[in-house]
Amino acid sequence: MFFTISTHKMSSIADRNDGSIFDGLVEEDDKDKAKRVSRNKSEKKRRDQFNVLIKELGSMLPGNARKMDKSTVLQKSIDFLRKHKEITAQSDASEIRQDWKPTFLSNEEFTQLMLEALDGFFLAIMTDGNIIYVSESVTPLLEHLPSDLVDQSVFNFIPEGEHSEIYKILSSHLLESDSLTPEYLKSKNQLEFCCHMLRGTIDPKEQPTYEYVKFIGNFKCLNNVPNSAHNGFEGTIQRSHRPSYEDKVCFIATVRLATPQFIKEMCTVEEPNEEFTSRHSLEWKFLFLDHRAPPIIGYLPFEVLGTSGYDYYHVDDLDNLAKCHEHLMQYGKGKSCYYRFLTKGQQWIWLQTHYYITYHQWNSRPEFIVCTHTVVSYAEVRAERRRELGIEESLPEIKADKSQDSGSDNHINTVSLKEALERFDTSPTPSASSRSSRKSSHTAVSDHSSTPTKMTVDTSTPPRQSLSAHEKSTQRRSSLSSQSLSSQSLGQPVTQPTMSQPATLQLQSSMSQPVFQFSAQLGAMQHLKDQLEQRTRMIEANIHRQQEELRKIQEQLQIVHGQGLQLSSGPCVPKIHRTDVTVPEMFLQQSTSGLNFSSVQLTSGNSSSVQQLAPGNMQGQVVQTNQTQSGMNTGHTSTPHMIQQQPLQSSASQHNQQNVLSGHGQQSSLAGQSQNTVSTPLYNTMVISQPTAGNVVQVPSSLPQNNNQNAAAVTTFTQDRQIRFSQGQQLVTKLVTAPVACGAVMVPSTMFMGQVVTAYPTFAAQQQQPQTLPVTQQQQQQQQQSQQDQQQQQQQLTAVQQPAQPQLTQHPQQFLQTSRLLHGNQSAQLILSAAFPLQQSTFTQSHHQQHQPQQQQLSRHRTDKMTDPSKAQPQ
């Protein structure tokens, strides 16, 4: 029984173990299934991504359009990478590590600099020798403009002996027709040869000069060459008969000079009308240079200041510049010719200068020269030089104009291979006449405004032209608005000389535009001529006016020095045909702007030979000064006066010069009309001719008491030797002179009064102390002449001639200042002035006295007039 129970227990345990094992297996299967599903998903994702990459890589492989399996794609990719690795290794071996091009330069600028450094230029030639492109660097090297070479045959610029060799070199690739494929053109086919090229000249008649050059280049296949006409004519071969690559193959070369140039001519103008300003001395040395000059000429201002402009000019231009500068010094302004200026980079640049002379604002003397320099191109220079030489483009040629733009694609003209071969077979070496004709025509003047290209026809080849092509070329030329030229050409034999073709070519349109430009230039020249003539007339008028003033000053000096009394301004100079004249005492009274010499008479001792004098005019200047002395304000104002001089009667009587003389009964009266109650001193000036130089003239305000002869004349003086005047009484001064020989009595104009300066005391000062106005001798006058010049701008005087020589007591308180009176043994001329300040009251008086034969009666008569003013009233 125990065994049975144990067996039963063991069976139950076994069943229980089997169930647990099954459950565990189920769980493990579930886990494995989940893992497998997850792994399958990731594997599928990886395969999909791999297929996508293989497909993309297969699409990038060239050559096969069919579908490739994965292994093929991978194999070709491996081959490409291997080849690329080899190419990279080769490139790294031949690569130059140094960076040649600076970062601040563009490709065009760097190319231009490299060409200048190599003394070379780019040239593109078709297989037949037609030039389709040339760089601008050809101008400083060969003196050709790019427009002179484009669309021309290269054989026109090569000596005849080298034509066949050059043509064989250019056509050498034609022998290998099998290899003439785009792949061959892209491969290495470098070609080098040397030859001579013609240098350009301004005058086509000059002897041709050739430069030895070297061509280094290769053939290129151009895909963008337009199917344009060659020299304005369409080819005769149909386009279908030509190879597809024929007119798109050209020889691109770098042409270098065998002998480098140390100083080159820089003719490329980057920006038109570039200019800068400078200032020069009259010796043409730099005084100033503005900020625009360094980018153009390379010099900084401090590098050229003080140097002569002639140090920078070309030796061939010195003669023309010297003539231009002479014209500048003659006319004051002008325009220079075209000349070459040496820059700091040792290159010649063409300039034209407009200059003018500036003058000092005070003395009008030439100070310096202001110049405005403008940069010009070689095309303008050559056109101007040819116009000066009178060269006209009259040779038989057909011109077609094109507009060239550096930023646009170059217009390339081609010709068929058959035409080139015919030309080579017919005339491999053009004649001398043909070459000279081409030489004279390839340097045609180009219009710088539209930059047209001059195209000519090779005269050794019969031109071919259709009507439609002629119409197209005519429309193209008219649309470009350049020189309108059309021509007709007739078939000529190939062997016919070039000089026989002018009859076959005719100009059909007039040169309207050049005529218009010439008219505009002629009008500008005429306008400039009119301005110069007007300026010349103004300068001549100024010179005449200055000469007239100088003549007047010379006459004034002659009057002062006694070399002849002549008046240049004024209606008349009165003359007295008496030798001995004495002027009587003068009576002054107040007046306004008008004073009349009603009757000024000069009577001789015997009362005979009276001659009337013509009236003269005299004007004064206005001088205002205010002086206050002893509480009295006296305004010294000299207003303009018009003095009418009436007929004068002359008389003379002579006395000894050593005695004190008095007037001999001669009189002159002044009649004035008072219009304003203004206190104005009158300046009366007398011109006196004296035969000797030792005379002293005194104008006393108080006469000496010890003079017995004039005892009656001082009865009104007080003990303190002061003259007393009443409120309404006028001031009377007696002037006594000695009889002298006088040839003329003159009332000069005010222009001479600048040489006379006097010192005037006020009326208050005259009442305090006696005054004597002596004229010092020559030594004292010269010492005080400097004081006279300072006062002559403040006072203006008038003069009346009168001989005088009193000998009175001298009181050196105040002196009468004169200029240039007594000089050596010459006849002295004395200008006296006496100013008498009047009280601020109106005096309306006129005096007329009778001639007294004796001195006592005259003195008594003068005393009565001073004491009793009623006697001085006009009768």
Swiss-Prot record:
GO cellular component terms listed in the entry, alphabetical order:
CLOCK-BMAL transcription complex; cytosol; nucleus
Modified residues annotated as Phosphothreonine in this record? T451, T461
> What are the Polar residues biased-composition ranges?
447-468, 491-507
Please give the residue ranges the record annotates as the region Implicated in the circadian rhythmicity. Answer: 516-566
Keyword flag DNA-binding: yes
Looking at the UniProt record, the site noted as Important for interaction with BMAL1 sits at H84
Q: For the motif Nuclear localization signal, what are the positions?
A: 32-47
The annotated regions of Low complexity compositional bias extend over: 476-490, 842-857
Q: Where is the PAS domain?
A: 107-177, 262-332
Q: Spell out the subcellular localization from the entry.
A: Cytoplasm; Nucleus; Cytoplasm, Cytosol
Post-translational modification note: Ubiquitinated, leading to its proteasomal degradation.
Crosslink position(s): Glycyl lysine isopeptide (Lys-Gly) (interchain with G-Cter in SUMO1): K67, K871
Residue ranges of domain bHLH in the record = 34-84
- Which tissues is this protein detected in according to the database? Expressed in the retinal photoreceptor cells (at protein level). Isoform 1 is expressed in both the retina and pineal gland. Isoform 2 is expressed mainly in the pineal gland.
Which function does this protein serve? Transcriptional activator which forms a core component of the circadian clock. The circadian clock, an internal time-keeping system, regulates various physiological processes through the generation of approximately 24 hour circadian rhythms in gene expression, which are translated into rhythms in metabolism and behavior. It is derived from the Latin roots 'circa' (about) and 'diem' (day) and acts as an important regulator of a wide array of physiological functions including metabolism, sleep, body temperature, blood pressure, endocrine, immune, cardiovascular, and renal function.
Protein name in UniProt: Circadian locomoter output cycles protein kaput
Organism of provenance:
Gallus gallus (Chicken)
